[in-house]
């Protein structure tokens, strides 16, 4: 796996699924391929994106700044600086300085990532802030190692929280989660269906599913009534794709 592929993988792992994620993935691909060279426009676009947490925006801004060639005097962006200040916690800053001293002696991506993984996400973000604010300089490879370690820490905690929700025995939470998943699957089906004639059936199924979820929420239903809703939708989607000649093995 190439270095940039690895960076893209880690960064996208902390971006919530949805149309915005696909957009960010495209921007990252363009940046890494050298197709997007307007850093200022890129940062302005990033700053105004909804849904993303300030820290995710900060990390993406850091990656764009590392990758896109820019004039030396180009102003640093406040939204990135604020996100990478370790919540203003002096402990994070102390640890970030110690980490920076270690990283300065490192030259490889994997070496830097290994060192950084033993620090908390707050300290890692602060260390990125030091480098972003030009208070310290490391090689691009080392900076990318720091980025990937930070994303791994964040993705780990997101995964723990997601697993807690998936394995919860609370029927109300499970019911709501199934309805949310069915609704987002229906939305994805509508987007994929496009405007071809064969799409009418898929659109109809998706529309009915969304109406059903809406009705279930409006009148309040038994927690078990949502069981299998998303799986039924996915079966319909795969049947539609087969007719269209698309073979997608797994959507679940």
From Swiss-Prot:
Note: Most abundant protein in virion. When expressed alone can form virus-like particles in transfected cells.
Region (Membrane-binding): 1-164
Family under the similarity heading: Belongs to the influenza viruses Matrix protein M1 family.
Biological process terms in GO annotation: viral budding from plasma membrane
Entry function: Plays critical roles in virus replication, from virus entry and uncoating to assembly and budding of the virus particle. M1 binding to ribonucleocapsids (RNPs) in nucleus seems to inhibit viral transcription. Interaction of viral NEP with M1-RNP is thought to promote nuclear export of the complex, which is targeted to the virion assembly site at the apical plasma membrane in polarized epithelial cells. Interactions with NA and HA may bring M1, a non-raft-associated protein, into lipid rafts. Forms a continuous shell on the inner side of the lipid bilayer in virion, where it binds the RNP.
Entry's Gene Ontology cellular component terms: host cell nucleus; membrane; virion membrane
Localization per Swiss-Prot or TrEMBL: Virion membrane; Host nucleus
Record bears the keyword Nucleotide-binding: no
Subunit structure and binding partners: Homodimer and homomultimer. Interacts with NEP. Binds ribonucleocapsid by both interacting with genomic RNA and NP protein. May interact with HA and NA. Cannot bind NP without genomic RNA.
Region of interest: RNP-binding: 165-252
Membrane topology: Peripheral membrane protein
Protein name, entry field: Matrix protein 1
Keywords, in A-Z order: Host nucleus, Membrane, RNA-binding, Viral matrix protein, Virion
Record-linked HAMAP family: INFV_M1
InterPro entries: Flu_matrix_M1 (IPR036039), Flu_matrix_M1_C (IPR013188), Flu_matrix_M1_N (IPR001561), Flu_matrix_M1_N_sub1 (IPR015423), Flu_matrix_M1_N_sub2 (IPR015799), INFV_M1 (IPR037533)
Motif (Nuclear localization signal): 101-105
GO molecular function: RNA binding; structural constituent of virion
Record bears the keyword RNA-binding: yes
